[in-house]
Design a protein with these regions (language model features):
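Flexible loop and strand-edge segments within Gram-negative outer membrane beta-barrel domains
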Residues: 136-157, 161, 171-218, 228-246
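Bacterial Sec-dependent N-terminal signal peptides
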Residues: 1-24, 331, 543, 549-553
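Surface-exposed extracellular loop regions of Gram-negative outer-membrane beta-barrel proteins
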Residues: 121-141, 258, 262-272, 277-308, ...
Length: 553
């Protein structure tokens, strides 16, 4: 693995990138919302705030000609920084099934346990319960070529979501808890400063909200508020242990002008409070919009108006425009011109990489322009394709740098998170085909061109230049399917820096369904036994196997 040289080069970028981060704060894309259909239970939703508070924003989709598509979800890709993912298709509840359980185990002590149940207490009361555990404990490649290290990573999640329906509105209460324990990769340097080699993150949240349920009301609305907490148990090189607490509020109001037109406004507010060396501030995001939906044209015209009180305070604005045009029945041309502000809190950094560390507080990321144009089509039954291209500018974009600052003084490797102004242009194509439950395949490729401030090109070492993915699921015999996935990602090469090792992952698997509710599955991952680091900044597991069983009830 040639990656150690990349780490040392990137580590030297910390001082320069720190200066760049001080130039101001701002966002990327629209308000990040996960839309969940009101009466559909999704056992994969872990975040208590991922509920249907914001109005639904549909992505462009080519009209389907017939119902000959495969009915099952495609197999999931490999996890990045976390352990191998169980390959199961029961992510969507079928019919009246209320419960779901899954258990899988594999090499390197990969484990994946999950259970969920949706309980209709009465005709007006519903309770959703979910718990999961996943992780690994085994030897994986080290950045030092030929070496391995004992990696341990486990995460536990528990959530409760309750809803009571009144005549006009519904009351929602919920909460979630997560514990994430892991160790850092040792640096193998001698005579260095001794920092904790393990870490534990504790995440908690709770919310209360109301949402309109009478579709005859002139104004549809939803409002939700609650508290989110993220705590670090141990110090790292740059930050003492402590917590970040966020009072999070979101909601919307919308009304119909007529059957084709609607106006509305979305709101999201975060009040950040820290007991670590971070500055407190409030971010308020408003999203007024107008929508038109005709027979062949869909239009959304809006704006993101964001106000921040400190640490990059000021007023920022960005567009929120979407246009779709359907022609020849099955072709959709679309144009998106978006933007906005993104909060870079501890949760966001943890999603970026569990092994994250920061030399100074992250600014919010601001995207004044995120433009995309494309064409989606389904010219024949079962066949779909998309051509697309876009360009995005983000101030204070996040970049992962393996190793971090003063690598030679640390006894462990962190993944440093840095910020700089990032510009990326991209273009790609995707093709998919599905016929009944016999075969389902997809292939897609995207080319990226990234640019940052001159002198900070090393920040792009883990950014993709070319992504290519292929997946196929084919019936072998009745109720038995074989699966194959391939993921390739060539990294950016800038200036005289070496190109980081490419992501090169081939996986195969099989699954067998019993009694229309039990699924037995297995998968071999990283079949080529390649050694590379993901954007999370840590090496992946080598060749490994996982098998398990799941059941809907």
């Amino acid at each position: 693995m040639k990656y150690i040289s990349t780490i040392l080069v990137c580590a030297g970028l910390w001082p320069a990138a720190t200066v760049c981060a001080q130039n101001g704060g701002e966002k990327d894309s629209t308000l990040n919302r996960t839309v969940v259909v009101e009466n559909q239970y999704n056992p994969e939703v872990m975040d208590a705030f991922k509920v249907n508070v914001m109005p639904e924003v549909e992505e462009p989709a080519a009209p389907k000609q017939a119902i000959n598509y495969a009915t099952d979800l495609r197999p999931l890709g490999a996890w990045k920084a976390t352990p191998m993912e169980a390959m199961s298709r029961e992510l969507a509840q079928k019919g009246a099934d209320r419960g779901y359980v899954r258990a899988a185990y594999g090499t390197l002590n990969n484990v994946d346990l999950k259970g969920s149940y949706l309980w209709d207490i009465s005709s007006k009361d519903r309770l959703g319960i979910m718990a999961s555990l996943y992780g690994l404990n085994g030897d994986i490649p080290h950045f030092m070529e030929g070496e391995e290290w004992k990696s341990r990573f486990y995460r536990t999640d528990v959530s409760l979501d309750y809803r009571h329906d009144f005549r006009k509105v519904a009351l929602k209460l919920g909460g979630a808890f997560a514990s994430q324990v892991f160790n850092y990769m040792p640096s193998m340097n001698e005579g260095v400063e001794n920092w904790p080699t393990t870490q534990r993150y504790t995440l908690g949240e709770g919310y209360v909200g109301v949402v309109s349920r009478d579709k005859d009301l002139p104004i549809q609305f939803a409002f939700q508020t609650g508290l989110r907490s993220f705590s670090l148990r141990y110090d790292n090189y740059y930050m003492v242990y402590g917590s970040e607490n966020i009072f999070h509020t979101e909601g919307f109001m919308a009304g119909n002008i007529n059957e084709e037109q609607q106006v509305g406004v979305g709101l999201e507010m975060d009040n950040l409070i820290h007991d670590v060396s971070q500055q407190d501030y409030t971010l308020l995001q408003l999203n007024p919009y107008y929508t038109y939906q005709g027979e062949s044209v869909k239009l959304r015209v809006g704006a993101h108006v964001d106000l921040q009180t400190a640490y990059g305070s000021g007023l920022k604005a960005a567009p929120d425009v979407k246009l779709e045009y359907t022609f020849a029945d099955t072709y959709v041309a679309y144009l998106n011109v978006l933007g906005g502000t993104r909060l870079n809190d501890f949760r966001r950094l943890n999603d970026f990489s569990p092994y994250w560390t920061i030399a100074q507080q992250m600014h919010t990321s601001y995207t004044p322009l995120d433009a995309k144009i494309g064409l989606k089509a389904s010219p024949v039954i079962g066949l779909g394709f998309e051509l697309y291209g876009g360009y995005r500018i983000t101030k204070n974009e996040l970049f992962a740098v393996p190793g971090g600052f003063y690598t030679d003084k640390q006894n462990v490797f962190y993944t440093g998170i840095l910020q700089d102004k990032g510009k990326v242009g991209y273009g790609g194509v995707s093709v998919s085909y599905a016929y009944r439950d016999w075969v389902d395949f997809s292939v897609n490729g995207t080319y990226y061109s990234w640019n940052v401030t001159e002198g900070n090109e090393g920040l792009l070492q883990l950014k993709p230049e070319l992504k290519a993915d292929f997946s196929v699921r084919a019936k072998v015999i009745k109720n038995c399917h074989a699966l194959l996935n391939y993921n390739y990602e060539r990294r950016q090469k800038k200036a005289d820096l070496k190109r980081a090792d490419a992501i090169n992952n081939l996986s195969v698997g099989a699954e067998y369904e019993l009694l229309n509710r039990i699924n037995v599955f297995g998968r071999l991952n990283n079949l080529l036994n390649k050694a590379y680091a993901t954007e999370a900044g840590y090496p992946v597991e080598g060749l490994h196997f996982m098998a398990g069983i799941s059941c809907r009830f």
